[in-house]
Amino acid sequence: MSSNPDLKGSSFTLSVLHLSDDQVENAVSFLQEKVNQAPTFFAAAPVVINISKVAGDIDFLQLKEGISQAGMIPVGVAGCSDKRMQNLAKEAGFAVMTASKSPSQAPAKMAPIKVVRTPIRSGQQVYAKDGDLLILSHVSAGAEVIADGSIHIHGTLRGRAIAGASGQTEAKIICNDLQAELVSIAGNYWLSDQIESEYWQKKTMFSMANDVLHVDVLAI
């Protein structure tokens, strides 16, 4: 059996910081605020910078340093078609990333649903790889539940729920009592302060439509 390294292509869900201008200080302050709100979710997480809406020059060295000081790991720049800007980004240590034009691969075969009957306590993490996650109890504040598919919680969601972890935008999050610290589908997330009060402590379903996260109250 060969013991040589092997280089293969793969796909990952990464957070993307979309800049609207060249004001690096504002971008770093925004990112720091998000990290402070959910440090367990964002700390040491990789982030890509999308600069497609930026008209002026960007101080990439300052941007990279600021992102690192905020607690995240800057890995690349997207939305950059200008060769000079690409070179500046590369000189600062960013990878220049482009959207893939190849057809998407067929989704992997889903695993059987993972069922958890006990409460998920603070500090615990449960992950359903290649499948859905069903929790028949509560998810405490400080706990994290993750699934490559959908997440169904029959109790109260007080912690973090991350569905579609490997990029499935059709994933859903359903909970009987919404009090979440964070909900995320395919890398699109809301923190607790982004959830309107009309949905709080209600039976709800989160889904994606047109690359935007939506929430609905369930009447059943």
Curated annotation (Swiss-Prot):
Keywords assigned by UniProt? Cell cycle, Cell division, Septation
Q: What is this protein called?
A: Probable septum site-determining protein MinC
InterPro entries recorded for this chain? Answer: CAP/MinC_C (IPR016098), MinC (IPR013033), MinC_C_sf (IPR036145), MinC_N (IPR007874), Septum_form_inhib_MinC_C (IPR005526)
Organism this protein belongs to: Vibrio atlanticus (strain LGP32) (Vibrio splendidus (strain Mel32))
PANTHER family for this protein: SEPTUM SITE-DETERMINING PROTEIN MINC
Coiled-coil stretches, from where to where?
A: none
**Could you tell me the gene encoding this protein?**
minC
Pfam hit, one: MinC_N
Assembly, in brief, is: Interacts with MinD and FtsZ.
From the UniProt record, give one GO term of the biological process aspect.
regulation of cell septum assembly
Q: Which domain of life is it from?
A: Bacteria
Cited function? Cell division inhibitor that blocks the formation of polar Z ring septums. Rapidly oscillates between the poles of the cell to destabilize FtsZ filaments that have formed before they mature into polar Z rings. Prevents FtsZ polymerization.
Please give the SUPFAM superfamilies that the UniProt record associates with this protein: Cell-division inhibitor MinC, C-terminal domain
Q: Does the keyword Cell cycle apply?
A: yes
Q: Which family does it belong to?
A: Belongs to the MinC family.
